[in-house]
Amino acid sequence: MAKVLLGFMGVGKSSVAPYLNGRFVDMDQVIEDKIGMSITDFFAKEGEASFRQIESETLEELLQEGDDVIISTGGGVVVTECNRKLLKKNRKHNVWLHSSFDVVYNRIKKDIKNQRPLFLNHSKEEFKAIYDGRMALYKGLADLVVTVDNRTPEEVARFIKCM
């Protein structure tokens, strides 16, 4: 089974994955290639339900690719029951990259290049509620929890490799 990096948006999944041993696949990039536009544009045009359907199909495909693949998921991959069931089948390989809300919030706020609809369309308080709601979902799926605050992507990857 594949190694799957889970965690809230902005936690550094796509930054850590290339430092791990294996074939790196950025799930968001795979989805964008499939839909022919950015996820932000797709969300605006087709809505969240359509996006989550494509996300589930993509996750199922990627989980079948073999033991050598390192999948960097989108932060919302855990919100649908279908995806959680797929990830539970992958039980021994789910790594939750955890970061405090303030660190994640500030990273996303500074990332002008990568504007995220969930961030842009909610107040800080609403965004915190979304963050809090997802923490239990990540925890329920994680075989390994790595706190990434004050660690470089290389340090996080070294820690994961040691486990």
Curated annotation (Swiss-Prot):
Catalyzes the specific phosphorylation of the 3-hydroxyl group of shikimic acid using ATP as a cosubstrate. Monomer. Its cofactor is Mg(2+). Pfam families: SKI. Disulfide bonds: none annotated. One of its GO terms (biological process) is chorismate biosynthetic process. It is found in: Cytoplasm. InterPro entries: P-loop_NTPase, Shikimate/glucono_kinase, Shikimate_kinase/TSH1, Shikimate_kinase_CS. Gene3D superfamilies: P-loop containing nucleotide triphosphate hydrolases (3.40.50.300). PROSITE patterns: SHIKIMATE_KINASE (PS01128). ATP binds at G10, V11, G12, K13, S14, S15, R116, R151. Belongs to the shikimate kinase family. This is Shikimate kinase. Pathway: Metabolic intermediate biosynthesis; chorismate biosynthesis; chorismate from D-erythrose 4-phosphate and phosphoenolpyruvate: step 5/7. The lineage of its organism: Bacteria, Bacillati, Bacillota, Bacilli, Lactobacillales. Binds 1 Mg(2+) ion per subunit. Substrate binds at D28, R52, G75, R134.
